[in-house]
């Protein structure tokens, strides 16, 4: 899950400053609704995969700084217990529901505990906003401008990129390769539309090596492993950074965290048909900064476009240079400066 991955990256960052700091990662859904957390996550996955238009509509119509939540008294008590248990000095949120609930808690209890929100996509929909949020950490100037338009004070916004684990930042040189390496990723469930046709057509090119990361999708893993023996098929792995570093191109969805993992490993992106509001925002950022190519329409031919791009060394190098520029623009001391204030 993206918000947990972001939280783990932030924890690594904090501990790299001071190994004695105690950082606790709490899945807010599991903590607040332990009996229903699996159902909530399953429902969310169904909503985004099967009813994406409804999901986009809900995000667009969410009210700015709306701190009203159901079961308010119960949730305030639970947050009280949580903060007491961990002797909390400050809270960092990587998911909208946590930002909303903690903001509501602060307003209700008149609490001064600092609340910092990391927005893990380029598009900042209204559910991220809370009246009592002390600082927003965002991925780009586009996100900052969007928050200002929504009424957030400029001095409460820090551009710092979207958090990724330290392993993605240790960009070591890769040995010379004889073939182009293409990495295909479809998130935790490994879902890429038309994956078999993509593999069939790309696999026929003798100058390309293919790696497919299936995540926890065992059915897809077995199916592709059997049907395409020359493709390097990988299940769930914590070494995604290694696969990215040795790849020349990543075919994937436009997740915010994945985008910045690619930026830190200098690996150009080929994005497949973004549709969710946050995916579209991330894709526009990728296109505007020329760090990848976007397949906006089902009509365009993915395999032909990928083969054309992978052969264009000049274009790939321009994309890598643009990724280098984005990395240089990020404020790497953002967190230390805030926490030590």
Locate the predicted segments by residue:
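Nucleotide-sugar donor-binding and catalytic loop/hinge architecture
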Residues: 154, 167-184
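Active-site-proximal region of nucleotide-activated glycan assembly enzymes
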Residues: 107-159, 164-167
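Donor-nucleotide binding loops and adjacent catalytic segments primarily
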Residues: 177-246
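C-terminal "capping" alpha-helix adjacent to the active site of nucleotide-linked donor transferases
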Residues: 288-290, 298-314
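C-terminal alpha-helical cap of glycosyltransferases
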Residues: 328-341
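Acidic donor-binding loop of glycosyltransferase active sites
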Residues: 245-255
């Amino acid at each position: 899950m993206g918000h947990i991955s972001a939280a783990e990256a932030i924890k690594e960052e904090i501990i790299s400053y001071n190994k004695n700091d105690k950082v606790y990662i709490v899945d807010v859904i599991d903590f607040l609704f332990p009996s229903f957390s699996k159902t909530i996550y399953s429902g969310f996955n169904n909503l985004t995969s099967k009813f994406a238009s409804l999901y986009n509509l809900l995000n667009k119509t969410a009210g700015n700084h709306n701190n009203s939540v159901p079961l308010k008294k119960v949730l305030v008590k639970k947050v009280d217990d949580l903060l007491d248990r961990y002797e909390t000095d400050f809270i960092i949120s990587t998911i909208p529901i946590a930002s909303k609930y903690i903001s509501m808690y602060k307003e209700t209890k008149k609490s001064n505990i600092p609340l910092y929100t990391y927005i893990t996509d380029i598009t900042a929909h209204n559910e991220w906003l809370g009246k009592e949020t002390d600082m927003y950490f965002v991925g780009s100037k586009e996100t900052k401008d969007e928050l200002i338009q929504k009424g957030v004070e400029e001095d409460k916004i820090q551009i710092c990129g979207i958090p990724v684990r330290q392993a993605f930042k240790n960009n070591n040189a890769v040995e010379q390769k004889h073939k182009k390496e293409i990495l295909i990723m479809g998130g935790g469930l490994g879902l890429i539309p038309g994956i078999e046709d993509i593999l069939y057509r790309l696999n026929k090119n003798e100058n390309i090596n293919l790696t497919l990361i299936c995540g926890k999708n065992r059915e897809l893993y077995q199916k592709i492993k059997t049907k395409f023996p020359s493709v390097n098929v990988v299940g769930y792995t914590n070494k995604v950074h290694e696969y990215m570093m040795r790849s020349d191109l990543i075919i994937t969805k436009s997740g915010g965290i994945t985008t910045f993992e690619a930026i830190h490993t200098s690996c150009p992106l080929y994005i497949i048909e973004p549709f969710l509001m946050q995916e579209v925002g991330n894709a526009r950022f990728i296109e505007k900064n020329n760090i990848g190519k976007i397949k906006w329409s089902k009509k365009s031919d993915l395999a032909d476009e990928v083969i054309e791009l992978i052969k264009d060394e000049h274009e790939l190098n321009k994309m890598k240079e643009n990724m280098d520029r984005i990395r240089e623009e990020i404020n790497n001391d953002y967190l230390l400066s805030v926490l030590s204030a």
